[in-house]
């Protein structure tokens, strides 16, 4: 009876260790896949953006990473669909950013 319990504990522990190993392997594969996607996005941006525009996008990425990610995705989609015929300049990127930036409500406080 003690041997059966010990064997059962060993079996459970072995299953747990196998699950952990598989989970870790899955996370490593996911991280590698994400790195590959990021590298492809960077390569695409290098091709479609002028250096000044790329610098502006990197500055935005430091302050608003989620917004920069959305802009990057938008630029890559435009390039993949063939709507970008030449490299995007800093001025064109500014115009795109102005379109994507949600308008802010302006509040005025008046005293009587």
From Swiss-Prot:
Residues 14-35 are annotated as: Disordered. SUPFAM superfamilies: Double-stranded DNA-binding domain. Keywords: DNA-binding. Signal peptide: none annotated. The keyword Transmembrane does not apply. GO terms for molecular function: DNA binding. The keyword DNA-binding applies. GO terms for cellular component: cytosol. It comes from the Archaea. NCBIfam families: PRK04239.1 (NF003268). HAMAP family: dsDNA_bind. Belongs to the PDCD5 family. This is DNA-binding protein Memar_1972.
């Amino acid at each position: 009876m003690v041997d059966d319990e010990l064997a059962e504990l060993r079996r459970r522990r072995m299953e747990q260790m196998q699950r952990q190993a598989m989970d870790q392997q899955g996370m490593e594969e996911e991280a590698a896949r994400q790195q590959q996607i990021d590298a492809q996005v960077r390569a695409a941006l290098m091709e479609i953006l002028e250096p000044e525009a790329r610098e502006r996008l990197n500055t935005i990425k430091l302050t608003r990473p989620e917004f920069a990610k959305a802009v990057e995705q938008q630029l890559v989609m435009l390039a993949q669909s063939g709507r970008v015929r030449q490299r995007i300049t800093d001025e064109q990127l500014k115009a795109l950013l102005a379109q994507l930036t949600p308008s802010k409500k302006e509040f005025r406080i008046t005293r009587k």
